[in-house]
Amino acid sequence: MNFLTVGHRGVMGVEPENTLRSFRRAEQAGHDQVELDLHLSKDGALIVMHDAEVDRTTDGAGLIRDLTLDEIRGLDAGFGERVPVFEEVLDAVGVPIQAEIKDVAAARVLAGVLLERGATGRVSVLSFHDKALAEIHALLPEVATVLVAEELGPHIVPRAQVVGARLVSLDIRRLNLDTVRRCHDAGIKVMAWTVNTAQDWAVARALGLDGAATDLPAEPAA
């Protein structure tokens, strides 16, 4: 594949993160994909938000798992934006989506939505949590899985292989050529997060990465 640019939570560097406004801006900016995060509400809706609680990014407070969809709908996520559910993002943008999940329960609900919406070929599922990825891979083996990790080492390749991931997403600050080569030799592509500065982009290309997640609409001038 060509070098893939992914709008991290949309373009969270300039728009309220994980909102429809942010995802649309990322698509308009020309990013190949958008990345988002999912948590389950008290009543089982797939809420698009990074944190487990609503405090940081809205005018509300509390854990997502303790709030109903209606309660979350009433919150302001910035510039008057509402917190979306996953299905709304599917409808709002045409580019492929990287959906990050945190647990097995979210994996099961997401699998159902992907089947219902016929989106198994359009959405790839990311996670730091191997069990969540393994669940998606077991339920929907046709869906692309992406292992996200902070720590590097020889364990990255076998971890990815166990959960069926053909792409890993790693911290640009810790990535090195040895890890990239090890992954590529195993047929696993490598992207980095979060690539924002001109130096970050230079490192990403020098390492021969396959893609990068960024908070910004465009690569900054060197």
What are these regions (language model features)?
Residues M1-A222:
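Phosphate-group recognition and catalysis centered on beta-loop-alpha active-site segments
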